[in-house]
């Protein structure tokens, strides 16, 4: 009968441990990606399940506004956890400058070739997967007819009946532009450089403002229950989606125009499973998926081969200089919080 020494036992135990550990070394990465993006209705209940079924991978999603999304990417820059980020163009400009997103040009995204040139900013550093419109959201029970002009928000009939979105949210540029237009008469697309006049005009709106918030879902709920008349200014992704579900809300088409809110998608630099990230973005740009996106998010498609769904009636949208916005945003946030929300 063989005699086992302590050395034999230790050697055998070590071999067993290595054998047990081996599967974890060779185990493949799970077929899943972490996507950070807006908390928009229709993403997790319609769009993402379609992509998951079609391509056989799991989408882990966390909804937050674009600036918070960027902060999360910064915090994990050394070891990214996110594969794709879906953010507004002004924040994607910052992400590009900080080198936390990777260019789409040259990536395996065939549908990118059919996307409009103006929807591939910065030489396809990212891509706009839809183009929703922002204006006044209003309660259709309490406001009849809907506002024909942004000027109606300043009417004393709406005292304490308006919620303004925080300037930390990109859509907050719309009431600032509307105020600048009312003060100067210039077209909305030219009013970014008239922000000073816009802030002075916004001060006149304060008696009508119940609160300033960064919690868009809560503001949307208050709009739907009739606690407020106007919400300035979410976009069609949320408002018309809720209208279609029976909520008493609508998106105004003021005579001064609506503002394009290009929604971008980008690959996070050095993010995990980049090939699945490319598949995800390519599917967002597929003509059939683009038609679903246009219908679901009430926005203009960006793939030129997409057949626009019947009944989608958005006017020509004011397109902004988002780089100018990005360069001035911090200054405007400080002024907004000093003079409008905190003054």
Please describe what each predicted stretch is.
Residues 114, 132, 160-171, 196-205, 235, 284-307, ...:
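Periplasmic-binding protein-like
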Residues 90-94, 224, 229-248:
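A ligand-binding cleft/hinge motif common to bilobed small-molecule-binding domains
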Residues 29-93:
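Early extracytoplasmic/lumenal segment of secretory-pathway proteins
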Residues 1-17:
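N-terminal secretory signal peptides and thylakoid transit peptides that target proteins
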Residues 135-142, 180-183, 261-276, 283, ...:
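A bilobed periplasmic-binding-protein/Venus flytrap-type ligand-binding module shared by bacterial periplasmic
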Residues 197, 301-343:
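An extracytoplasmic/periplasmic, membrane-proximal ligand-sensing/linker region
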Residues 38-45, 81-82, 86-210, 214-224:
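Extracytoplasmic ligand-binding site segments that recognize negatively charged/polar headgroups
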């Amino acid at each position: 009968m063989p005699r086992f020494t302590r050395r034999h036992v230790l050697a055998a135990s070590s071999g067993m441990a290595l054998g047990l550990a081996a599967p974890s070394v060779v185990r493949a990465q799970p077929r899943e990606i972490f996507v950070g993006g807006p908390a928009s209705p229709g993403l997790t209940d319609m769009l993402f399940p379609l992509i998951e079924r079609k391509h056989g991978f799991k989408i882990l999603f966390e909804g937050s506004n674009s600036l918070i999304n960027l902060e999360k990417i910064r915090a994990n820059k050394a070891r990214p956890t996110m594969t794709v980020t879906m953010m507004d163009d002004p924040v994607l400009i910052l992400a590009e400058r900080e080198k936390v997103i990777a260019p789409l040009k040259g990536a395996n995204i065939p549908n990118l070739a059919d996307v409009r040139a103006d929807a591939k900013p910065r030489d396809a550093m990212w891509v706009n997967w839809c183009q929703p419109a922002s204006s006044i959201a209003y309660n259709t029970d309490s406001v009849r007819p809907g506002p024909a002009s942004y000027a109606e928000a300043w009417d004393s009939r709406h005292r304490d009946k308006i919620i303004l979105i925080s300037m930390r949210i990109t859509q907050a540029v719309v009431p600032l532009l509307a105020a600048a237009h009312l003060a100067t008469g210039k077209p909305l697309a030219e009013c970014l450089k008239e922000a000073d006049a816009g802030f002075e005009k916004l001060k006149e709106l304060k008696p009508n403002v119940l609160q300033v918030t960064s919690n868009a879902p809560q503001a949307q709920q208050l709009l739907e229950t009739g606690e407020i008349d106007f919400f300035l200014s979410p976009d069609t992704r949320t408002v018309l989606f809720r209208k279609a579900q029976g909520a008493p809300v609508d998106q105004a088409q003021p005579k001064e125009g609506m503002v394009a809110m290009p929604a971008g998608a980008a690959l996070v630099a050095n993010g995990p499973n980049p090939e699945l990230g490319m598949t995800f973005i390519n599917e967002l740009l597929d003509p059939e998926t683009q038609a679903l996106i246009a219908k679901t998010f009430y926005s203009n498609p960006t793939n030129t081969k997409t057949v626009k769904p019947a009944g989608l009636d958005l006017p020509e949208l004011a397109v902004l200089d988002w780089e100018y916005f990005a360069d001035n945003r911090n200054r405007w946030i400080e002024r907004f919080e000093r003079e409008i929300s905190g003054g």
